[in-house]
Amino acid sequence: MASTDKPGGDPEYRTSSTPAPAGVDYFKFDVILRFLLFAASLVAVVVIVTANQTEVIRVPQPVPWPAKFRYSPAFVYFVAALSVTGLYSIITTLASLLASNKPALKTKLLLYFILWDALILGIIASATGTAGGVAYLGLKGNRHVVGWNKICHVYDKFCRHVGASIAVALFGSVVTVLLIWLSAYSIHSRVPK
């Protein structure tokens, strides 16, 4: 009886001498996005740190009353989180530049980037949400709680700085989402089909 098997064995289990596909190289876009993340972090920190304004408030006597980011723990956390994000983006930009010359490191580095980018995204999102909540209270106040009055009609420059800083941080979080997507897609394109 003749065998119907091919001489090479089952093609599913045959080892191939061809290397796995290299995938499309998106490291140039990765470096650009990481630089944008650094720029967004830096701008957001500089804008909120320079958000100082002093106004004369009329209580029984006119008293100068300053508004600074240091007076709110939410804004301090915002500055700390975006400073960490800026440092992280510098380190990962340099790692991307170094790995672009070494193809063997790219896939492994992409996996680490996905994990760390997701962590940084959580930090940016929590800091932006916290600062946004306090900024909203400054803009609208809360008439149900004594002492939580609107302040943005008095401290207009301070509120504009805080709002601009939060908007730039939101842009940074979108950039981080794009970095995660780009790393995941790069890994997916390297998987043999």
UniProtKB/Swiss-Prot annotation:
Give the subcellular location: Cell membrane
Topology in the lipid bilayer is annotated as: Multi-pass membrane protein
Q: Which GO terms describe its cellular component?
A: plasma membrane
InterPro entries for this protein: CASP/CASPL (IPR006459), CASP_dom (IPR006702), CASPL (IPR044173)
Q: Which residues are glycosylated?
A: 52
**Would I find Phosphoprotein among this entry's keywords?**
no
Tell me which parts of the chain lie in the Cytoplasmic compartment.
1-30, 95-108, 183-193
Task: Give the family, as the similarity comment puts it.
Answer: Belongs to the Casparian strip membrane proteins (CASP) family.
Quaternary state and interactors = Homodimer and heterodimers.
Q: What is this protein called?
A: CASP-like protein 1D2
Originating species? Glycine max (Soybean)
